[in-house]
Amino acid sequence: MAVIALDLGGTKIASAIVDEAGGVKFTHKNMLQGRTGHEVGRLIVDSLARQFDKAQYHRIPITAIGICVPGSVNCATGHVWAPNIPGWGRYPLAQEVLTLLPEHKVPVYVDNDRSCSVYGELWKGAAQGCRNVIFMAVGTGIGAGIVIDGHTLHGANDIIGATGWMALQSPYIEQYGPQGCFEYYASGTGICNRAKEKVRADKSYRGSLRQLPISRISTKHVFEAYDKGDCIAASVLAKAVEMWGMATANFVSLFNPEKIIWGGGVFGPARVFIPAIYEEALKWAQPLSIKMVELVPTQLPDSAGLLGAGFLALNNGKVQLD
């Protein structure tokens, strides 16, 4: 048995055929290139059609489609709210796939990237054998996939895991509103923006970030500057570590997980901070629970969402650990 898995990211679509053993074949990527609304939906359908053609040529029976998307998903209807894709306010993705690929007649399962990432780690990554695990995805934004007692948590409106809005610092300032307090300081976007602010404000600063036009400073540049001992990069990342540690403490105290897995584009370079994150969490968390949790980097930095989408489809849209 095999399924088609598709992972919609912020800049590209990845698709593949995934079998029951976790084998991945015919991985294909398409760049979004500024597409919006139905243009993105059409590109998804084209990617799926390409995989169906591959499956037919190689005589691989396809039983379902699993799709991983950013934002929030109504898992019952397949409607998607993806704020980074204009026109995807309540986008009927599952129905569009079924309508535009009527000849294939297989079920379509859609879930958010937070949940799909934790599915991938449970199946083939750092969470194998766990029943209580949290996947922290830190990239442009911050989100969490949460599995407790073998069940994925989705919430009343499928919005669980929008952790960028965790309230970690007082008093409230208006700048937190669009992305939340946690993302403001500790997402890739937040790290980049806080570094730009500090460079702009400190006229006496002559570190490595000053060598770049402020508008061109990226999160990657901040980590590179940190490695060179840059004071602004060190300050910005120290604040991010503090926030990551406080968030970890909150998750540990609320959910008592076995593992918290750190992934997304930032963890990458930020995986070196995992011991410091644990030390910060140790100050704040429930004292017994924090000593029982393990903080680890993802084992699937490039494929957790895609494998998770495959796992979702292979399990008929219901991931529940026995």
Predicted feature residues:
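Glycine-rich beta-strand-to-loop/alpha-helix junction loops that act as flexible
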Residues: 65-71, 261-269, 298
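N-terminal, positively charged, Ser/Thr/Ala/Gly-biased leader segments
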Residues: 1-4, 11, 18-25
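Glycine-rich phosphate-binding/hydrolytic loop that grips phosphoryl groups
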Residues: 18, 109-122, 268-322
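Short glycine-aspartate micro-motif
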Residues: 3-7, 62-66, 109, 133-137, ...
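Glycine-rich phosphate-binding loop and adjoining helix at the ATP-binding site
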Residues: 32, 38-45, 57-65, 71-134, ...
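Proline-aspartate-enriched helix->loop->beta-strand connector
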Residues: 248, 252-261
